[in-house]
UniProtKB/Swiss-Prot annotation:
<feature type="binding site">
    <location>
        <position position="66"/>
    </location>
    <ligand>
        <name>substrate</name>
    </ligand>
</feature>
<keyword id="KW-0520">NAD</keyword>
<keyword id="KW-0664">Pyridoxine biosynthesis</keyword>
<dbReference type="InterPro" id="IPR024531">
    <property type="entry name" value="Erythronate-4-P_DHase_dimer"/>
</dbReference>
<keyword id="KW-0963">Cytoplasm</keyword>
<dbReference type="GO" id="GO:0033711">
    <property type="term" value="F:4-phosphoerythronate dehydrogenase activity"/>
</dbReference>
<feature type="active site">
    <location>
        <position position="237"/>
    </location>
</feature>
<feature type="binding site">
    <location>
        <position position="175"/>
    </location>
    <ligand>
        <name>NAD(+)</name>
    </ligand>
</feature>
<dbReference type="InterPro" id="IPR029753">
    <property type="entry name" value="D-isomer_DH_CS"/>
</dbReference>
<dbReference type="GO" id="GO:0005829">
    <property type="term" value="C:cytosol"/>
</dbReference>
<dbReference type="Pfam" id="PF02826">
    <property type="entry name" value="2-Hacid_dh_C"/>
</dbReference>
<dbReference type="GO" id="GO:0036001">
    <property type="term" value="P:'de novo' pyridoxal 5'-phosphate biosynthetic process"/>
</dbReference>
<comment type="function">
    <text>Catalyzes the oxidation of erythronate-4-phosphate to 3-hydroxy-2-oxo-4-phosphonooxybutanoate.</text>
</comment>
<feature type="binding site">
    <location>
        <begin position="206"/>
        <end position="208"/>
    </location>
    <ligand>
        <name>NAD(+)</name>
    </ligand>
</feature>
<dbReference type="GO" id="GO:0051287">
    <property type="term" value="F:NAD binding"/>
</dbReference>
<feature type="binding site">
    <location>
        <position position="45"/>
    </location>
    <ligand>
        <name>substrate</name>
    </ligand>
</feature>
<dbReference type="Pfam" id="PF11890">
    <property type="entry name" value="DUF3410"/>
</dbReference>
Amino acid sequence: MKILVDENMPYADQLFQQLGDVQAIPGRPVPEGVLDHADAFMVRSVTKVNEELLKGRAVKFIGTATAGTDHVDQSWLSQAGIGFSAAPGCNAIAVVEYVFSALMLLAERDNFELKDKVVGIVGVGNVGSRLAERLAVLGIRTLLCDPPRADRGDAGEFWSLEKLVKEADILTFHTPLNKSGPYKTHHLVDVELLSVLPDNRILINASRGEVIDNQALLTALKCGKKLRVVLDVWEPEPDLSLPLLELVDIGTPHIAGYTLEGKARGTTQVFEAYCEFLGQPRKVALSDLLPEPDFSRVTLHGNVTQSTLKRLMHLVYDVRRDDTPLRQVAGQKGQFDYLRKNYLERREWSSLTVCCDNRESAELLAALGFSTELI
């Protein structure tokens, strides 16, 4: 059995070699001829999986080690009798921690307290729901917008996007990309929405680039619209708009979900799904794969303040480490993908144990996702 895996899937060799011969390949572009005799192909979001890629091939299973699936033509796979699995929620914690890292940086730059802001979350799936939970731990008011969940009658109060725009100080987008239908998210942020969005708001997109009309956003910023903007995703990728990058406050190369833990979850989820597909069910413990972090313990005395939180969060991950390299190489052919392919190891807050002399601090940090000990 021949199994192809994206070269940026950690632990793929270690896991999939239990099932057959494994070959790691670039996801964009897919090398000519490699699919000719493959039985399965494990991809990430850079690979467009469709009839053009797979017609006439022997591939019987596609796994994407990502939560998003808009790069996969699932309808065609089903018609062709090809098995498919994604990894929902695998990088949700990573994206939440990316958003916090960005917000802490902006709060320091603009001298505001997050607890005084209202956060509007658009898309309350794996990422949005976890973000809401962690904001609630800090006593920060959140407004939720998720039309599909609202129409299903899910528990909770859901706001329309129109009302959210008027009420929220911070708008953060965590939707899938739907190009049509009743829940279309393509260009959810367009000329019209930007025209009614009050000045001095924070706009964050860590979902899919096309959720925001990048040209409309560029025009608004050029015309003096006063916004703080954080973009991890772009329209298009990898050839993002250089003028837009120059005007946003934080710009990164689609890496919000790129923690080692998140990538490992994605790999293990598609591995387990492929094992099920083969009729050989297996389970993998993430803790058996992950290495000890280089820096794993810190001591905290006293209560947790926003300044303390910023230091702890940025000790694990400071978003500036990804903003600066992108600005240095943007516009150079292949560099967007190079930054993603050669991404420096990044861990999640849970990799850091905070030793506290205060039970209240330990409980708060644990609720946020840090590992804690009382001293």
